[in-house]
Amino acid sequence: MPPVVVLIGPPGAGKSTVGRALASRLAVSFEDTDDVIEQRAGKRIAEIFLTDGEAAFRQLEKAVVADRLAAHTGVLALGGGAILDDDTRALLADHTVIYLEVEFSEAVRRVGLNRDRPLLLGNPRAQLRALMDARRPLYEQTATHTVGTTGRTPDEVADEIAALITVREENR
């Protein structure tokens, strides 16, 4: 049985926080593929980027996402860049995928720009803006639903997603 729902979105969208709240509401488990990657690699994502490079990280991410899409039955949050891979996007076509959309200023506030985020090195504000702009079309193309998170609590967002899932299941 596949995940109940898959959450995608940029850093700061609330994938992990909303995912935990949603899993609690649905009485299912929650997994974040970034956590699974770190467990399997035995090191933090930032360290993987520094020691092995982004290409090696993306290969590991692709394998973990494919595995968890096949095996996890709860709420699954993907890392922000997972949708960059064509094969991953193809796998997601068979799932309920929620794009957690967030305004840039809110993402900056949530991420903090001083955190352990390897793709935001250098000028973090400019890097985050470029990353969000480049990935937005892929998030929109991949998602079955888009839910805004700006100015909302994780509980409000989780409630909206739970309602969407219920309606979707009733219409199947």
From Swiss-Prot:
GO terms, biological process:
amino acid biosynthetic process; aromatic amino acid family biosynthetic process; chorismate biosynthetic process
What domain of life? Bacteria
Q: Where is the signal peptide?
A: none
State the UniProt keywords alphabetically. Answer: Amino-acid biosynthesis, Aromatic amino acid biosynthesis, ATP-binding, Cytoplasm, Kinase, Magnesium, Metal-binding, Nucleotide-binding, Transferase
Under Enzyme Commission nomenclature, its number is 2.7.1.71
Q: Which pathway does it take part in?
A: Metabolic intermediate biosynthesis; chorismate biosynthesis; chorismate from D-erythrose 4-phosphate and phosphoenolpyruvate: step 5/7
Co-factor remark: Binds 1 Mg(2+) ion per subunit.
Checking SUPFAM superfamilies in the record gives: P-loop containing nucleoside triphosphate hydrolases
Localization annotation: Cytoplasm
UniProt keyword annotation of Nucleotide-binding present: yes
- Catalytic reaction(s) noted: shikimate + ATP = 3-phosphoshikimate + ADP + H(+)
Identify the residues that bind Mg(2+).
S16
Question: How is this protein annotated for GO cellular component?
Answer: cytosol
What the entry lists under HAMAP family is as follows: Shikimate_kinase
Q: Which family does it belong to?
A: Belongs to the shikimate kinase family.
PANTHER family noted in UniProt: SHIKIMATE KINASE, SHIKIMATE KINASE 1, CHLOROPLASTIC
Described purpose of this protein according to its UniProt entry: Catalyzes the specific phosphorylation of the 3-hydroxyl group of shikimic acid using ATP as a cosubstrate.
What name is this protein filed under? Answer: Shikimate kinase
Q: Which species expresses this protein natively? A: Acidothermus cellulolyticus (strain ATCC 43068 / DSM 8971 / 11B)
Q: What is the lineage of its organism?
A: Bacteria, Bacillati, Actinomycetota, Actinomycetes, Acidothermales
Gene for this protein?
aroK
